[in-house]
Amino acid sequence: MARRALLGALAGAVLGAAAARAAYAAFTRRPPVGDAETWNRTNHRGEPITLLEGPAFVAGAGAAAAVLPGFPVRLRAAALLAVAGGGGFGGYDDLYGVTSSKGFKGHLTALSKGEVTSGAVKIIGIGATGLAAAALTSRGGADTAVNGALVAGSANLANLFDLRPGRAIKVGLLCGAPLLAAAVRRDDPVRAGLAALSLGAAAALLPEDLGERAMLGDAGANALGALLGLAASVTLGRPGRLAVLGTVVALTAASEKISFTRVIAGNPVLHRIDMLGRRPVEQAPGHR
């Protein structure tokens, strides 16, 4: 019986959820940077929404990673690096980003022409922190490169799904659940706790996201993806990691050519999952 892993998962999920909710409540009263208007944006319906859910996820998941019992020092440092890199550079893009260059390819094309966009800063920054996090938990240069790409690539991919209410969190929960199950099956409380803390923090903020009161933004989505990428890098064997990395690369490349929103809308199963918990189009949101 995987009792130790279940306890580790429970501790991670509870700590992540409690810290994320506390952070969201605190940030809605006093934002971490600027005032409430600094974080206000317009969503896909043309309605006001706040990005403060992102910093709340970063703070909640980071706090859980910092205090969760039993974490080895290097893994704890790697988790903090991943969430800080994704959240910090994602937050920079949230606050200072412009839309003249879009997508991974767009930012790199602009960089090749000497234009340093906020997106390019984010790509380089998350790449560097992802590689640093991987170096703390990997053996040898090849593993470090694969794991670093997995952390950074997952951070970027998660952000590509943050275009509709709840979508990025749902994708995170669906991707993180198998990692949590694998850790529990092996009765590994450390890896179970790592996967669970990000899932707990994300699930705790899902009602705000589905209610269209808040969204993860780059800060939250990048941090969620980076943590799940780190969890995959320390939970899966090399074949599994390479398979996941290949999927991340393929989906990222596909996003430059196709719209994920159109693909999801055109598939009955994906569309049903995407709409689960969301308010009807004609219903007015209850903003808080």
Predicted regions and their residues:
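C-terminal membrane-associated helical module and adjoining short loops/tails
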Residues: 234-288
